[in-house]
Structure formats: C-alpha cells, structure tokens
C-alpha cells in the first residue's frame, strides 16, 4: 500500500468529569474501526486547525465550541500506509443541541473509564500528558499495522516502552509506555543487580559482606532520595535481561563488567502504590536479580546524576536490620534482600 499523509483534528470535549467519546462502528475501511476516539476529522482546503476543529465538532455532534485549548500535534503512523498529523484539542465550553453522528455512537464517558475502552494504546499516552497538564507537545506514535505500538517519542525524544506480562511472567504481546504502565499498574520486567564485597569475618569465622546501595536522585518519579539496589532498571520492549543488567550498570554507575561477573539469583515479584509529585504511582514488576561479588574499583564509578545522587557501602546484616526496622530511608523489598544473603 502506498503511504500517504493527512492533516486532521481530534477533540476531547469535557463536561462533569466526562469526555464525549465516539465509538467508530460505521465505516468498513476505517483505520479507527471499532475504536473509541474523540471527535474531529480531516482538514478541508485552506482551513486552519481551529477552523477545522469548529466545523468538525459542529458536524459530528451538533455543538458549537465556545472554549477550547490546543494541546499538541500527534504524528500517527499506522504501519499499514497511513500517516496522519493530528491536531489535538480539548474543549470545556460549548452550546447548542446534540445531534446524531453518522460515523458511530456518541457517549459521555467518565474520564477514568475511558482508559478501559477499546482505544489505541498510544492514546493513553496523550491522555496522560493532558491529565498532567504538560505544555504544548509533539507526540509521535508508530504502530505495526496490526494495532500494536512499536515506538513513541515526545518532543523528539524516545519514550520508554515495556513488554507487558501475564501473571505467569510470559509476554502478553502488549507494548505500553512507561508512564502509562505505572499509572495502570501493568506487570512488566526489570533487572536488579546487587554489588557486594567481603568485609572480613565475625565470630565463628563466618564471612561478612558489605553491600553497595545507591541513593536515588531527588528528581526520580518514585521514591526520590531513598536508598535502593546497587543498580536497577526497566527492560525496554524486546530487551534480554542479562544485557539490560549490563547496560544499567554502565549507565547508572559507569561500571563495565562481563556477563560472567553477574551471578543470577532468581526472580522477584514486587508491587506497591504510593503518591509521588502529586500523582499516584503504581509499580508492578517482575525482577531478574543478579549479584556481583567481583572487586570493583570505586574510583572508576561515574554516577548518572539524573538517576543516582550518591552510593554507600553498608554491612549486609546492619542493612538488613535497618530495612526491617525502617530506620533506613529505602525502597528495597526485604524478601529480595534476603535472596541476596542466601
């Protein structure tokens, strides 16, 4: 199929905590067939985005807009030959009487329930950006031709995409953006690497160990300023756990090691919900846990400022006690820490 580009508007009208949604069920050859979307349509000759917006809303709903906001440009690449530059609006003022739409069924839907409808996965990204009142943005969404999200970028910068997992740890086939996954509590995969070193012996000649903790940056989206695993990170869609662990070590701490230096401990399932920066954060992860016992040269550490504020060596048993007693500000799962000590 030959590719072609189109200009369009897309508007989400809001009233009483609800969006006016259009269930696209009429057209047979519609890229949005059976999806729920906002109202809008393609530009006519010589129209500005606002002129197209006002005309399309009037034609599809019967309403005349009196207050609206231009939120951003969404570049939609369907993967089957359709590329569309959507001018995204929200509107909170309108007048007139509702009219039936010849492209599907119109329904006022609670904004919280919109996420549960049959919508494009990438639409959840711009719903999140709107909800967080992000300034005017450019969002690019690329699909695989079968409705699956392949890539997303915000203002020219790639966004993190995760493979979403079933409860048994297998992949669902769904790919979801990081912020959306943490809003919905979607199960995804991570890597956790603990760095330990000998710290002498204690009574009975039992070997003592120290563990390296990182202090999370104050700008992190969860648990800012807390002590955490030596190195940790999400697996991007398609990533292999061991390769992801090696990458995170280099990015966060500036450490280059070989795959043979990482000893696999097992998998850990962890989840929590808590508010950060005024928004609820819902983490739900399946972590691949590794341990490094090789002596590392601390002088070679190069901390990634956006992720890591500082690092701290602490004797393992002392750390375990302080985690249990809550005297160490941390976001470490106690049962995972026990895995490291076994």
Where are these regions (language model features)?
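Nudix hydrolase/Nudix homology domain
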Residues: 101-159, 179, 225, 266-277, ...
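Short, well-structured hydrophobic secondary-structure segments
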Residues: 44-82, 192-195
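Residue-level signal for well-ordered, solvent-exposed loop/turn and beta-edge residues enriched
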Residues: 18, 69, 148, 168-170, ...
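Acidic, metal-coordinating catalytic segment for phosphate/diphosphate chemistry
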Residues: 1-10, 158-202
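Conserved Nudix-box catalytic region and its N-terminal flanking loop in Nudix hydrolases
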Residues: 19-59, 145-155, 180-191, 203-247, ...
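Active-site segment of metal-dependent pyrophosphate-handling enzymes
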Residues: 62-97, 111, 208, 218, ...
């Amino acid at each position: 199929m030959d590719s072609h580009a189109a200009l369009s508007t897309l508007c989400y009208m809001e009233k009483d905590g609800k969006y006016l949604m259009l269930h696209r069920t009429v057209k047979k050859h519609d890229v949005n067939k059976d999806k729920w979307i906002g109202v809008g349509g393609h530009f006519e000759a010589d129209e500005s985005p606002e002129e197209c917006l006002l005309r399309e809303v009037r034609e599809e709903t019967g309403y005349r807009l009196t207050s609206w906001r231009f939120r951003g440009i969404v570049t939609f690449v369907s993967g089957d030959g359709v590329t569309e530059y959507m001018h995204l609006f929200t509107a909170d003022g309108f007048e007139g009487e509702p009219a039936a739409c010849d492209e599907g069924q119109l329904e006022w839907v609670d904004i919280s329930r919109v996420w549960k409808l049959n919508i494009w996965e990438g639409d959840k990204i711009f719903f999140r950006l709107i909800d967080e009142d992000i300034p005017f943005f450019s969002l690019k969404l690329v699909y695989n031709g079968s409705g699956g999200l392949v890539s997303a970028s915000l203002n020219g910068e790639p966004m993190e995409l995760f493979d979403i997992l079933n409860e048994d740890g297998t992949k669902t086939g769904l790919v979801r953006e990081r912020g959306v996954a943490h809003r919905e509590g979607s199960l995804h995969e991570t890597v956790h690497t603990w760095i330990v070193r000998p710290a002498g012996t204690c009574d009975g000649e039992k070997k003592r160990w120290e563990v390296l903790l990182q202090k999370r940056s104050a700008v992190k989206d969860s648990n800012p300023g807390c002590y955490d695993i030596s190195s940790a990170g999400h697996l991007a869609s398609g990533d292999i756990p061991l390769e992801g662990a090696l990458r995170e070590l280099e990015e966060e701490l500036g450490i280059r090691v070989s795959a043979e230096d990482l000893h696999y401990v097992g998998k850990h399932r962890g989840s929590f919900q808590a508010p950060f920066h005024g928004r609820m954060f819902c983490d739900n992860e399946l972590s691949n846990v590794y341990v490094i016992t090789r002596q590392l040269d601390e002088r070679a550490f190069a901390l990634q400022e956006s992720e890591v504020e500082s690092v701290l060596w602490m004797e393992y048993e002392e750390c375990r006690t302080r985690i249990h007693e809550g005297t160490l500000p941390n976001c470490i799962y106690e049962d995972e820490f026990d895995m490291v000590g076994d």
